Amino acid sequence: HEAKTENAVQANMELEFKRNRERFGFLKWGSSAFHNMLVVPPGSGIVHQVNLEYLGRVVFNTNGLLYPDSVVGTDSHTTMIDGLGVAGWGVGGIEAEAAMLGQPMSMVLPGVVGFKLVGKLRNGVTATDLVLTVTQMLRKHGVVGKFVEFYGEGMGELSLADRATIANMSPEYGATMGFFPVDHVTLQYLKLTGRKDETISMIESYLLANKMFVDYSEPQVERVYSSHIELNLSDVEPCISGPKRPHDRVPLKEMKADWHACLDNRVGFKGFAIPKEAQVKVAEFNFHGSPAQLRHGDVVIAAITSCTNTSSSVMLGAALVAKKACELGLEVKPWIKTVLLQALGVVTKYLAKSGLQKYLNQLGFNIVGYGCTTCIGNSGDIDESVASAITGNDIVAAAVLSGNRNFEGRVHPLTRANYLASPPLVVAYALAGTVDIDFESEPIGVGKDGKKVFFRDIWPTSEEVAVVVNSNVLPDMFRATYQAITEGNATWNLLSVPEGTLYSWDPTSTYIHEPPYFKDMSMSPPGPHGVKNAYCLLNFGDSITTDHISPAGSIHKDSPAAKYLLERGVDRRDFNSYGVAVVMMRLWHVHFANIRIVNKLLKGEVGPKTIHIPSREKLSVFDAAMRYKSEGQDTIILAGAEYGIGSSRDWAAKGPMLLGVKAVIAKSFERIHRSNLVGMGIIPLCFKAGEDADSLGLTGHERFTIDLPSNVGEIRPGQDVAVVTDTGKSFSCILRFDTEVELAYFDHGGILQYVIRNLIHSKH
């Protein structure tokens, strides 16, 4: 975001339309070219919240034929709809495009993990504390590729918004979906959000008749699940997660000790390796004429943001914290970048009705708009003086956000420590100005009367929050907000677009280009490809994220993408995010360009480089890949567990394909990324259980041969495949084409090529 004032929403929406006119025009053209395509106008809110409160049907009624609602979406947090009792999950953009063209979705029948909830949350514990606890438990249990179904008497204690928060975080705990069956709480929510009474009655009758409705006030039959896990809600305690992964939960009472351990620990998910003598460093700087200081752990970004933590209880809870803080005379340091980004306009309405928005404004949390910002790295620059103090003194600065992901380099390039927290805790940490604090024994600040103010002085009780929620969140707010979806807004309605069913590509555009995947495509499938004497382009450890592979968020001023745009006359103020700019297509060297990436070929060095094995030269990943391609050499990637964790970003598969990567050999893959690799024709292989590159003695300096039959009919999903190296080592891997149709995609060179050939054949 750019503007942060009382009229920030309008100012930022105008900027959004100005910068995204070409993109919005393309989408609006699509909505007129295709009869069954609805485009929700920009500024309406984040898609998952719109799904939950407006688009979700729960039960479809098509000319009197009733059947359950379902959804797939190109964002991994599509799972939020599972909180409403609608089966839904995220898929890669490639797979979604194929589905839009009529290709059925295929999957291996998943195991179902039963998650039993009992008891009740303690006073002052938030839905965010619960979801971070659930995320840690399920990551430890292991649920990748599985469904999780929540049940138990504790369900009656959770609001629909609480359930949606847990469902939203399914990608962070690794499940395909986290499902909450429909009950009376679901029906009450449908009424709250403005659904018609007759529709709600139809939903209840259909689900009761089909034994798909649950009444938690009655005794429940214990169902049989693939595996089982249980949580007593009274055991959940206030917590945050970080500094580098969503499932690294830290109880609030242990945060100060955990922070100091992270400073000491070697570089890793829980370590920064700051020498003892450097841990007390104070960076002096000048902030717009006033002296200022930064220390390790100081907060420079505090953001109430994302689609995850948008429930009325946590949003109004944050506002109550702000109210108490303002009344006691507390302030946020002026160099902390504060962000309040809403998932939808209803939040704006109930914050205004409650009279609490003014206190958030007073602390710098003005509403800046509706959409994805800090959570994906789109919060804008921090002040230049703060940035210089961080880089000049090697300060481990912190961001605290109510988002769902905190992977390295994602939130901001200069915040090495990133913590996920509830919206009320975001406000508390902004007031404290540091994560290096024990909230139980140390004051957050000094009030206007000179008295020390503690965390307990500003934290609202559950009863206080409930009173504000019940009196300020009303059905009419939802009806008024979603009326705008059908009516649009003035700027969207005035946007002119070309007519016709074929889009006219503009070759001079830096934004939208014709994709290169069908260039020179013949009607005959190319057939399966093996890998011959391939070099290892990159050798990774565990938890390589799609942010490591392919950037998202803002385009940094010194990046190759920025250089490309500047050379084409694009003003820096008009740079947009990687995710929507054509630099993704033209600048293949933005892939694997994350400054925090660790490539084992570099023997401990951190950064986006690799070794060109034949020459032993250290090059950028792009330059090394292009040299291999020019020499006619195949390349592969070695990786550890959870390869491709994070966003469902299809560019994390498109980019490696364009770089010439033929296969990825990993301990395990995150579900959506594996699917995306298949969709782009890259072979996913898994080491056998108990094995990895290190245990097999692989350094990445070998050459790898993977023999596959030239006839796809001779390949089976999940079969063993031999991998042979030029050093004489050989080992067996599991071929992670999971279904017969995925083998067909591989035979055709990718899913879109398969679908297009089939469409052409069907026309003839």
Curated annotation (Swiss-Prot):
[4Fe-4S] cluster binds at residues 307, 372, 375. It holds the Pfam family Aconitase_C. InterPro entries: AcnA_IRP_Swivel, Acnase/IPM_dHydase_lsu_aba_1/3, Acoase/IPM_deHydtase_lsu_aba, Aconitase/3IPM_dehydase_swvl, Aconitase/IRP2, Aconitase_4Fe-4S_BS, Aconitase_4Fe-4S_dom, AconitaseA/IPMdHydase_ssu_swvl. PROSITE patterns: ACONITASE_1, ACONITASE_2. Signal peptide: none annotated. Pathway: Carbohydrate metabolism; glyoxylate and dicarboxylate metabolism. GO terms for cellular component: cytoplasm. It comes from the Eukaryota. It is found in: Cytoplasm. It catalyses: citrate = D-threo-isocitrate. Its cofactor is [4Fe-4S] cluster. Gene3D superfamilies: 6.10.190.10, Aconitase, domain 3, Aconitase, domain 4. Substrate binds at residues 75-77, 405, 410, 568, 648-649. Keywords: 4Fe-4S, Cytoplasm, Glyoxylate bypass, Iron, Iron-sulfur, Lyase, Metal-binding. Binds 1 [4Fe-4S] cluster per subunit. GO terms for biological process: glyoxylate cycle. It is an enzyme of class 4 (lyase). One of its GO terms (molecular function) is metal ion binding. Its EC number is 4.2.1.3. Catalyzes the isomerization of citrate to isocitrate via cis-aconitate. NCBIfam families: aconitase_1, PRK09277.1, PRK12881.1. Belongs to the aconitase/IPM isomerase family. This is Aconitate hydratase. It comes from Cucumis melo var. conomon (Oriental pickling melon). The gene is ACO.
